[in-house]
From Swiss-Prot:
Originating species: Leptospira borgpetersenii serovar Hardjo-bovis (strain L550)
GO biological process terms on file: 'de novo' UMP biosynthetic process; pyrimidine nucleobase biosynthetic process
Presence of the UniProt keyword Flavoprotein in the record: no
Reactions this protein catalyses: orotidine 5'-phosphate + diphosphate = orotate + 5-phospho-alpha-D-ribose 1-diphosphate
Reported cofactor(s): Mg(2+)
Protein name, entry field: Orotate phosphoribosyltransferase
Length: 187
């Protein structure tokens, strides 16, 4: 399963360009991993979430919490998919979505989902570069009274994000690291 995911990422999500891409972190890179090409395609998302639930959690020592959540939009489909995989085992593991900004109407909540049912959460992201988006989600979860126990992401770009997140007290367990994709040309 993991090898198939790696091949799908290389085929569908990875892009190289002489003209650098601007990443969410603001950094520039000729290497771009658009994991939404995995998470927004049903059969690819299903394979990803099945791998996370059936293999990655146990192999990484990730505790099974009450919820999986992260910053919209990278985490959204992954959290929903993981929740549905657990439903196949007759377990309710809730998806939580963290907004980037609170709305100026309604409840003004940053964290959406069954927050009242949840005390602990595994934080989720698709790609981590500097860790800024993940840290924003962790802080919003904590402000909502949720303990973030650990984290999972599809790809660690190996640019300092894991250390920044660990400094927040959360250990991340990436499925892949950029180095897993071979000797990509240096920046």
């Amino acid at each position: 399963m993991k090898q198939k995911l790696l091949e799908l990422i290389l085929t569908h999500a990875y892009r190289y360009s002489e003209q650098p891409f601007t990443l969410a972190s603001g950094k520039k890179s000729r290497h771009y991993f658009n994991c939404k090409e995995i998470t927004l395609v049903p059969d690819r998302l299903e394979l990803l979430c099945k791998f996370i639930v059936e293999r990655h959690l146990d192999e990484s020592g990730i505790l099974k919490p009450q919820a999986f959540g992260g910053l919209t939009m990278g985490a959204d489909p992954i959290c929903y998919g993981i929740s549905l995989e657990f439903r196949k085992q007759d377990k309710n593991i809730y998806p939580l979505i963290v907004r980037k900004f609170s709305k100026d109407h309604g409840t003004n909540k940053l964290v959406e989902g069954a927050v009242h049912e949840v005390k602990s959460c595994v934080i989720v992201d698709d790609v981590i570069t500097t860790g800024g988006s993940t840290i924003q989600a962790i802080r919003s979860m904590r402000d909502s009274g949720i303990v973030v126990v650990q984290g999972v992401c599809i790809l660690d770009r190996q640019e300092g994000g894991m250390d920044a997140i660990l400094a927040e007290g959360v250990q991340m367990f990436p499925i892949f690291k950029k180095s897993d994709f071979g000797n990509l040309e240096h920046e």
